[in-house]
Amino acid sequence: MLLSVLIIYGSTLIFLKVFGKQGLYCFTSIATIAANIEVLIVIIAFGMEMTLGNVLFASTFLVTDIISEIYGKKEAKTAVHIGIATSMLFIVLSQWWLLYTPAKSDFAMPAMKTIFSNTPRLMIASMLVYAIVQEFDVWAYHKWWDWTEKKFGSRYKFLWLRNNGSTLISQFLNNLLFTFAAFWGVHSVKTIINIVISSYVIFIVTSLLDTPFVYLARRMHKSEMKKVEAKQE
């Protein structure tokens, strides 16, 4: 699990370094689609039941926090809207594939149906929860930012507070709403509650672990801006 966090979170910095803001928008689309496929799989991690897509879902909060910190609230909301649009398009495409009549030699359609027959409910639940929670996360991030600036007189300091203050609350809402919307009637109530508890424990860990990556992203951006300014002089 820790290796997954390091690879996925590290990938956000690579996308930022190579492609800039557009790279983070691209990463949002990739993470949104992949997480909604992975979430079908329930695994045992650290002795608890959890869905496999937790780290990828958490990475979308990391991306919006990085964008909020570097580029601003408007750009962060754009990332959220891209994630929603990506989910909507993927729902349509994944269901369109299932309408085709496979050839006699085909071997993939049964597996595709197994995966994507559950996709609409999961994706719609995810899309609605994502829209609500990510909008809240962006709003909360900037509310924390305004509060720390007013309280301590610095707009640069206390990144860790606005990052974790917004993400931990948002992750709880995301976990609770999505798990019940996606798995009610699919798993037992006991399993759903176990998923909620275990997933939030994981989300707490992933939320705390993403803070250094936000600091690194800000430092990378600041370094790039200095290079641009040096070239212009």
Task: Set out the residue ranges of the language-model regions.
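Hydrophobic transmembrane alpha-helices
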Residues: 1-67, 74
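Hydrophobic alpha-helical transmembrane segments
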Residues: 3, 25-26, 55, 80, ...
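Small-residue-rich segments of transmembrane alpha-helices in multi-pass membrane proteins
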Residues: 28-40, 62, 83-95, 162, ...
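Transmembrane alpha-helix boundary signature
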Residues: 38-47, 70, 92-105
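Membrane-interface interhelical connector segments
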Residues: 97-121
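Alpha-helical transmembrane segments and their cytosolic interface
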Residues: 136, 142, 148-233
